[in-house]
Design a protein with these regions (language model features):
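Short, well-ordered beta-strand segments
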Residues: 398-400, 572, 601, 672
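Donor-sugar nucleotide-binding helix/loop cap in glycosyltransferases
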Residues: 650, 664
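Substrate-binding clefts and catalytic carboxylate motifs of secreted carbohydrate-active enzymes
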Residues: 572-583
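Short Ser/Thr-rich beta->loop micro-motif in glycosyltransferases that lines
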Residues: 480, 651-657, 675
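Alpha-helical solenoid repeat scaffolds of the TPR/TPR-like class and their adjacent stem/linker regions
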Residues: 1-564, 576, 586, 615-622, ...
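Glycine-rich phosphate-binding loop and adjacent beta-alpha segment
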Residues: 674-675, 680-683
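The conserved SAM/SAH-binding core of class I Rossmann-like methyltransferase domains
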Residues: 432, 603, 674
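A conserved nucleotide-sugar
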Residues: 426-428, 589-619
Length: 767
């Protein structure tokens, strides 16, 4: 009787349902509410309560249907409209959620929760203008709602409204001056703007308010990494993990120790990161990079494999693993791996770094694509320094050469004499040494050749770019490109009005802020210009500079001392092991099988590379003893004397010899090369063309093999070519550094004049 009495009174019925819910008698409550719906069809409160029960039990669709039923009874219920918005948000039906939030706001424009939840959706949908308006409405309703200021600031920063973003952070600080999170987030904004000293100031303020502040300590550490102040970075990163473990802090500590060559500490922190998050691929990949750098390639491959099991699409992982395998001549699944990388590049995925792409493919279009993908991901144009000023035209053009290899390095050997011969009446020379190099004879020569030699190894990228601007460098010449020790971020900020890619990296950078690449017509014919993001400064002869006189020691080298039989024909390849492909190696082994008294001579590769090459040789039916491996000479003058023991140098494909080709040709050893299309392939062909030795350039694998056989079986022809080579080396303009210097200076002047005539960069033919 009591229940019947209750069911005749809507208020008593509703109270009873609430009582049952509070006593966890949910089923009884639902039964009463459903009965009440029938008895009181115009009373929407029962339907609303049923809807809430459904939503709280995650029966979202039932809840939505009940709320809609309630609106049929009374459409002017702002809270029901709001609840429908929440339900559709939970169901990820975002447009429907917005529709009901907007309807609710019409009836109840002061309900701040409507706009807070709508902001969540607009952020997901990346509808930034509407999102900004939404945050402004929240601030109107509650001027002290901090998240509306800080979240809006982040959006304004992302769309380039930096000053507006900064103003919002300052307002947030006025409202809550003792909130450490605001200072920390403000520091992040300055960090993103590369205003590092201001970032440090705000991180320190955050720590002053809250000393137990691991996030601010970590962020401070990362700022000091950017500033290349590694000891300070280590100190702050270690403070960030005093009371809690942090994956990012561990990986960054490991990366710093790796950069400082503290190998034991680097591995300790990579392993800590892996232990903390074994399901994350990042630490495995970074550990593999470190192991690569210390030549523990087998361990690097294992770390890459661990990362692959977690995330096959981790950026650059697949390409770097293949590069590591190639460096030890492990060619298992080589063709499949190459095919996969090609496919992923065409899908514009970050699958291989540019240098590896050059090693994998003789296709300048694919190389350009790989470089563009990499630049967009790693080093996009950075406008944090603002547009560069147009300097007045001066009598002397200020050239800035940027390199991490001003020391005992092949690039330095090639350009030292060029630096010395630059016309100081026309040019003022600045060197920016971007990585630490030990003192050496070559570095001393280079330092003397410049008007200013500036060691910026410990400067941040922004500081280097600013310094170049302060010095009013007219032309910045990047001698690194996409190679080790390069600092592409410097050029992404525009270090100079004219920026040039030269020598260190044999290919396009893919960067829209690099204006020119220096080359020659042989390497980049007109029909391949579209494969380069830069315009081309064409030198009239070979693009590669060379020393006029190379040092050759008087030390006597004999075949016997190198383990080479006296009476055999010596094929050799002194390229890096990662340039050797299974395809080219098969040709070399066929040569050994056809030329009975012959050997293949290599430099001192790693023990793993030697083992794998011997195994491949055995598989192909040739005695592994016919592969001879010599130690690498510490002094280049000894190297130049030693390589004369070879009869023929066999070039690799698709990534061919460059300075190595020059070394062997100067030593009187003919170089057989297989011409392709890419920059990294054609340098040897360009050198040979300029030496008037185009007969050493082959256009097919068959021609390559046949020419090698001809030399090995026709000693008179070999003698004739060697005599021609030695004569041409002495007579060729290839080794006339003064003539080369005049040509490259002509290219610089033309690029400079175009700029001051307000003309866009265009292809230039140096004189």
């Amino acid at each position: 009787m009591a229940t019947k009495k209750i069911l005749t009174n809507p208020e008593e019925t509703f109270k009873k349902a609430i009582e049952l819910i509070e006593n966890n008698q949910l089923e009884s409550a639902i039964n009463i509410l459903k009965e009440a719906e029938k008895n009181f069809p115009n009373e929407f409160s029962f339907t609303n309560l049923l809807a809430q029960i459904s939503l709280e039990n995650n029966n979202i669709n039932d809840g939505i249907n009940l709320l809609k039923k309630s609106l049929q009874i009374n459409p002017n219920q702002p809270l029901v409209l709001f609840d429908l918005g929440i339900a559709f948000l939970k169901n990820n039906e975002l447009e429907e959620a917005i529709k009901f939030f907007d309807k609710s706001a019409i009836l109840d424009p002061t309900n701040i929760k409507i706009f807070i939840n709508k902001a969540v959706i607009l952020n997901k949908l990346n509808r930034l203008d509407e999102l900004i308006n939404c945050y402004q409405k929240i601030i109107q309703l509650d001027p002290n709602y901090i998240d509306a200021y800080t979240n809006q600031a982040e959006i304004l920063y992302s769309i380039g409204k930096v000053d507006d973003a900064l103003n919002l952070y300052y307002k947030a600080i006025e409202i809550e001056p003792q909130n450490p999170s605001i200072y920390n987030n403000f520091g992040n904004l300055f960090n993103n703007l590369d205003r590092l000293d201001e970032a440090i100031n705000f991180y320190e303020k955050s720590i002053k308010i809250k000393s137990e502040n691991p996030s601010a300590y970590k962020n401070l550490g990362l700022v000091f990494v950017k500033k290349r102040k590694f000891n300070e970075a280590i100190n702050y990163l270690k403070k960030s993990i005093q009371n809690r473990e942090d994956y990012g802090a561990y990986t960054n500590l490991a990366a710093i120790y790796s950069a400082l060559n503290s190998n034991k500490e680097a591995l300790i922190y990579y392993d800590k990161a892996i232990k903390l998050k074994p399901g994350e691929s990042e630490a495995y990949v970074l550990k593999a990079y470190h192991l690569q750098s210390i030549n523990e390639i087998d361990k690097a491959i294992l770390a890459f494999n661990d990362a692959l099991k977690i995330n096959k699409d981790h950026k650059y992982l697949f390409g770097e693993r293949l590069h590591s395998k190639n460096s030890i001549c492990d060619w298992t699944n080589f063709e499949n791996d190459i095919s996969w990388i090609n496919k992923r590049l065409k899908e514009k995925k970050c699958v291989a770094v540019p240098l590896s792409v050059c090693a994998f493919f003789d296709d300048p279009e694919i190389q350009k694509l790989g470089a563009e993908i990499y630049i967009k991901d790693k080093y996009p144009f950075n406008n944090n320094l603002g547009k560069i000023s147009k300097y007045s035209k001066n009598k002397k053009i200020k050239l800035g050469y940027f390199s991490g290899d001003f020391g005992e390095h092949p690039v330095a050997y090639l350009v030292t004499e060029l630096f010395e011969l630059h016309d100081k009446a026309k040019f003022e020379l600045f060197a920016f040494s971007v990585s630490n190099k030990i003192k050496s004879k070559t570095r001393a020569r280079i330092e003397k050749s410049f008007d200013e030699f500036i060691d910026v190894a410990n400067y941040s990228d922004k500081e280097v770019a600013l310094l170049a601007r302060e010095k009013k460098i007219d032309i910045a010449i990047d001698l690194g490109g996409h190679t080790k020790n390069s600092r592409s971020s410097i050029f992404a900020m525009r270090a100079a009005p004219i920026q040039i890619n030269y020598l260190g990296y044999p290919g396009t950078t893919g960067a829209n802020y690099i204006d020119y690449i220096i080359s020659d017509k042989f390497i980049i014919p007109n029909e391949l210009q579209h494969c380069y993001s830069e315009k081309i400064i064409y030198l009239p002869k070979c693009y590669q500079p060379n020393e006029e006189n190379i040092p050759i020691s008087k030390k006597i080298y004999t075949r016997k001392n190198e383990g080479i039989p006296e009476s055999v024909f010596v094929f050799c390849c002194f390229n890096n092991s990662w340039k050797i492909t299974p395809q080219i190696f098969k040709i070399w082994i066929r040569l050994l099988s056809k030329i009975e008294k012959s050997i293949l001579w290599f430099p001192g590769f790693s023990s793993l590379a030697i083992k794998n090459l011997k195994n491949e040789c055995f598989k192909l039916g040739v005695d592994e003893k016919r592969l001879v491996f010599s130690s690498i000479e510490n002094l280049r003058e000894d190297h130049h004397a030693k390589i004369k023991l070879a009869d023929i140098f066999l070039d690799c494909f698709p990534y061919g010899a460059q300075s190595t080709a020059s070394d062997f040709l100067r030593a009187g050893v003919p170089v057989i090369t297989l011409r392709g299309k890419s920059f990294s392939n054609q340098v040897a062909s360009s050198i040979l063309t300029n030496l008037n030795l185009s007969e050493l350039i082959t256009l097919s694998e068959e021609d390559y093999e046949n020419l090698a056989i001809k030399f090995a079986t026709n000693p008179n022809y070999l003698k004739e070519i060697k005599e021609k080579l030695m004569f041409n080396v002495k007579a060729s303009p290839l080794y006339n550094v003064r003539e080369y210097t005049n040509s490259i200076e002509s290219g610089y002047i033309q690029a400079y004049d175009r700029y001051h005539d307000n003309l866009n960069p265009d292809n230039v033919e140096a004189k």
